């Protein structure tokens, strides 16, 4: 039972990402695995047409970025189009240029808060522009926000509207996935991971995971929930 995670763990993940519990699942230890499964689901099934049946599939990758994101895309033969970071997100003019010059970009994968290694915190305006431009470009354009450092404000940091709220504002939830984990909160390779997405993308991810696993480790979920009752407990732990 509970293939999406125990209720309390889903509730915590939803609170962390400001998402709805109905659109939140709890995975294994790694959010990277959830991203891989999400890309695999689009490759095999797709929101409209499976990526495996399309040519010149590409993704926009902010640089400098996470090498595992790049390796993941390489596995699927997805072309990577780089866009520089500016200190407060991606270079929007370069982002627009990539959209204009390439016909089959399937999305962007980025770390919107404390991006490693530059430390960029994407401004609300930057995220909003990414969402609006990508949505106008294609109904298949995915916004994958790997929020690996969501609660890692060790010093005063810029405030940021939750990505879920911005995606909802721009009517882009069905194309948006937000992920985070406790890899750098509790135990590396021993924490929890969470994914939240709009209905269409969420159902696609669930479809893929249902074919691969029966359930994630619910005992580990309970272990964490006994330690973290809510988001405030997580934030207090991270001070």
Model-derived features with residue positions:
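Walker B catalytic acidic pair
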Residues: 147
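Conserved core of the PLP fold type I
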Residues: 1-139, 150-170
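Short, charged helix-to-loop "capping" segments that act as catalytic/coupling loops
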Residues: 134-143, 172-173, 231-233
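Hydrophobic "anchor" residues on beta-strands that sit immediately upstream
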Residues: 107, 142-143, 177
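Conserved core segment of the aminotransferase class I/II
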Residues: 167-239
